[in-house]
Design a protein with these regions (language model features):
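C-terminal motif of bacterial Sec signal peptides marking the signal peptidase cleavage site
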Residues: 19-23
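A ligand-binding cleft/hinge motif common to bilobed small-molecule-binding domains
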Residues: 123-129, 246, 251-271
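Extracytoplasmic ligand-binding site segments that recognize negatively charged/polar headgroups
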Residues: 63-78, 90-106, 112-249
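Short, polar/charged alpha-helical segment
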Residues: 47-61, 67-88
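Mature extracytoplasmic/periplasmic domains
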Residues: 282-283, 287, 291-349
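Bacterial lipoprotein signal-peptidase II cleavage site
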Residues: 24-34
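Extracellular/periplasmic bilobal clamshell ligand-binding domains
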Residues: 331-373
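Periplasmic-binding protein-like
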Residues: 159-163, 223-228, 234, 268-293
């Protein structure tokens, strides 16, 4: 599956980006963005959207980082922004992790190729709030309070729920997490990554915990589940990818619903890939947008936020099978055809706090290797 953040590769990439900038001799930007755009906390503070658009077009450029074109439909989102505003988007290091976004911003501070905006996991956003410029988009009130910083330093943009993707021609449709222990799934169940390092895999173990008597505070039943899955011979220790799915090597994949659902579209006509979000184990998470306080293009950065939180931007996320943060407030403005393709969710939805996630990660670090060794 597509991942954001192979650490070794991305650290090399950030270093390469720094060297490339130095080689090009790009003129340094000021440490603090000049003009009102650098401190504006809303479009109104700049005189309204027309003034913001005018200022952004004058800058003429936007630097983004860690936005793979096939992830949450960012390829189309970037093209739509460029076409709408005639602003060039420079997309650097598309596979960088959230922490590597921050590392790049620190290393490139003062240069006109430094990231203007970030797309971050919550833990990294919380740890780096002092690097962000507070800004509230025009649709601020539509964003649930629990998914945004009260001051506008960062806020959820898109997310999803952990899911089970499966080849309907090779296995029966699972109706619960526990179904994966049945003989029909022998040698067929793959997890997207190492849960001690990858967010998707971590949430996969949390899903297993919820489906086996655990809670947001207790991941141990999830670790025990995967131990049983391994003992039953059902766990397939292969990193899933479109190629392993198409070849039949990984006919069952535990991953985010938007990445699994994207495979349904990609593999249409080749195999019948279906996705289910277990009703008893709905663990969700959102990525977060933030503007760099040192953004070399502060007006374009703010216009980017306005665009992706507009109906147009949110529908582009939806088209990419992710769940835009404003979806519940969009009503009939949401793209119905795209919305209808989302995996169904019925039941209690769980979103971990950072404290709960940190506790779970500590348990995983201490027990995972032994459980599946």
């Amino acid at each position: 599956m597509l991942k954001r953040g192979n650490v070794t590769t991305k650290l090399i990439g950030v270093g390469a980006l720094v060297l490339a900038v130095a080689a090009c001799g790009a003129p340094p930007a000021k440490d603090t963005p000049a003009g009102a755009a650098g401190t504006a906390k809303s479009a109104q503070e700049l005189g309204g959207m027309d003034k913001l658009v005018e200022a952004a077009k004058k800058e003429g450029k936007l630097n983004v980082i860690a936005l793979p074109p096939d992830w949450a439909n960012y390829g189309e989102i970037i093209k739509a922004f460029e076409a709408k505003y005639s602003i060039k988007v420079d997309s650097a290091q598309p596979d960088a992790s959230s922490q590597e976004e921050i590392n790049a911003a620190k290393q490139l501070k003062g240069n006109d190729r430094a990231p203007d905006v970030f797309d971050l996991g919550l833990n990294v956003a919380l740890a780096n709030k002092d690097l962000f410029a507070p800004y509230k988009v025009s649709t601020w009130e539509d964003i649930p309070a629990e998914l945004k910083d009260a001051d506008g330093a960062y806020y959820g943009d898109y997310g999803g729920f952990m899911s089970i993707g499966f080849d309907a021609a090779k296995v029966p449709a699972p109706t619960s997490v526990k179904d994966l222990l049945k003989p029909e799934y022998k040698g067929k169940v793959a997890l997207n990554g190492d849960p001690t390092q990858a967010g998707a895999a971590f949430s996969g173990v949390m899903m297993a915990a919820l489906g086996n008597g655990g809670s947001a505070d207790d991941i141990a039943p999830g670790v025990e589940f995967f131990k049983q899955l391994k003992q039953a011979g059902n766990f397939q220790p292969v990193d899933p990818s479109p190629a392993t799915i198409e070849s039949g090597q990984t006919p069952v994949v535990i991953d985010w619903d938007y990445t699994n659902a994207a495979q349904t579209e990609k593999l249409k006509g080749k195999l019948d890939w279906k996705v289910v979000v277990p009703a008893e184990a709905q663990i969700g998470a959102y990525y977060n947008q933030a503007i760099s306080k040192d953004a070399p293009h502060p007006a374009a950065a703010r216009l980017w936020q306005e665009f992706i939180y507009s109906d147009e931007g949110q529908n582009l996320y939806l088209k990419g099978m992710s769940r835009p943060v404003r979806l519940d407030k969009m009503g009939d403005k949401a793209d119905k055809a795209a919305k209808d393709k989302l995996p169904k969710t019925d039941g209690k939805q769980v979103f971990q706090t950072q404290q709960q996630a940190d506790k779970a990660k500590a348990v995983l670090t201490a027990t995972w290797a032994q459980a599946i060794g």
